[in-house]
Amino acid sequence: MFSLDGYKAIELSPRIVPRIMRVDGSIEEGDVDPCGRPWVMWEGRFPPDNSLFTIYASTGMPFDARRDWAVGEEGPAPDDSPLGLEQERMTSHNGSHVQGGKGHISHWKGVPDDMKGLWELDLETFLGEAAVCNLSNLEPQAVTTESNYPKEYPKAKFWLPKAEPGEIRGQEILPEHLSNVQKGDIVLMASPFAGLEQPWLSTRTVEWLIEDRKIKMLGLGYPGIEWQYDLKVAAPDNSPVKRMLLGANIPIVHPLVNIETIASDRVFYYGMPLHVAKLEASFVRAVAFEEQGRSS
């Protein structure tokens, strides 16, 4: 029989407190996920037995106004939410979530025709042996040449050009920094750095993870690892990390927390997506099981 005796369960999903509007009209304030996305809910009542349920709000308008507008009203959507949530939204990319290729980037130029959706991947993709890569030793350094940093880097709402020599930036993550990654692993990456000082995942390292290590999923702490860059570059060179991994049917799970608290360099990971067809991403409750007494 399978047993977790001798293992410690470590929470990898950030705890999120939703903002919720109760049926009595009261509002309970919430917070946002690590990426700054709000979790917004409306409470409803099930008439047959007077039980309560919650609706994940997709816009700032009240439910009735949303429904009425959706069935044929012309013009912009109503903007009269008592919650003041006009710019807030809920998608399957809120909180810790796993994303696949089909339905997410399948419209991009140059992606493989055989790219799969989450619902088409084997269950074993989302659980199993995982390499823990805490990259706290990759301290930011002064850039020596223009070519050793991504062409574009997001910071707040601005797009910065390539880093110039002498500027402080995160280091490139290389295969030599991931020596504990074994073939067929799930890989969990984190670092204590943020912003421009985060170590960044280069395309040559992603290629090594795909072709040599044949990893089955990549999990990323946030902040800590920069992997979403070159977003505005013309296809087929845009978003290279996402493009390469999802194109190889290797899902990405993020934003994760507590990776840096794991003492061992190997754990058992579990984090299942919802069993829903055509869902390009799914909420997950990600957990790492660390063997007690084991360390790196």
Residue ranges with predicted function:
Residues M1-S296:
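Active-/binding-site microenvironments in catalytic and ligand-binding cores
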